[in-house]
């Protein structure tokens, strides 16, 4: 976790950064037949101050939105809003091809307080998507980018303005490889493996 680089410690305590947060899903059911043609999933706080980019997205691709704070009066033609769900119900409600991890007021880059936060810390949203069986899309300058590229469980982009072209150049076979890897990572997340690994190091 890159935030550790920003912290100066004056103690002798052993620290260990989680690669990604675990996310337990009761009664998980694996998805089949995912396709890269599906909409991009955005789940979480959809309010202007955290997700203002939702109101200035390009016309493609399509987006499926889940969460609170969304201003439906400003909904774009390529957005479908499904409302909010209880945490245990949300994973099974998600529909799409990729989960998007993006914050801030701009679709050009992750900006503002919430966008800058992604440089240094991991998002629980990423764990939700992966644990639910979806590959993810992350900002190229985010703390999660290296993890995603190393595990080949998603893609990174510098701007959402580039996303249509990136997806057009991604073959169905390449997408299915991302799905396979995302499901493998997701299983470890659901089992609590990343926390257990951290505890083993600390012990």
Residues covered by each model-derived region:
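Conserved catalytic-core segment of nucleotide-activated headgroup transferases in glycan assembly
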Residues: 17-95
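Nucleotide-sugar-dependent
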Residues: 91-132, 138-146
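A short, active-site helix/loop in glycosyltransferases that binds the activated sugar's phosphate group
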Residues: 1-15, 147
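Alpha-helix capping/helix-boundary segments
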Residues: 2-6, 47, 136, 143-144, ...
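A short acidic/histidine/glycine-rich donor-binding loop in glycosyltransferase catalytic cores
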Residues: 151-157
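A charged, aromatic-enriched C-terminal amphipathic alpha-helix characteristic of glycosyltransferases
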Residues: 32, 158-161, 165-167, 172-203
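A short acidic, amphipathic alpha-helical/loop segment
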Residues: 6, 52-56, 166
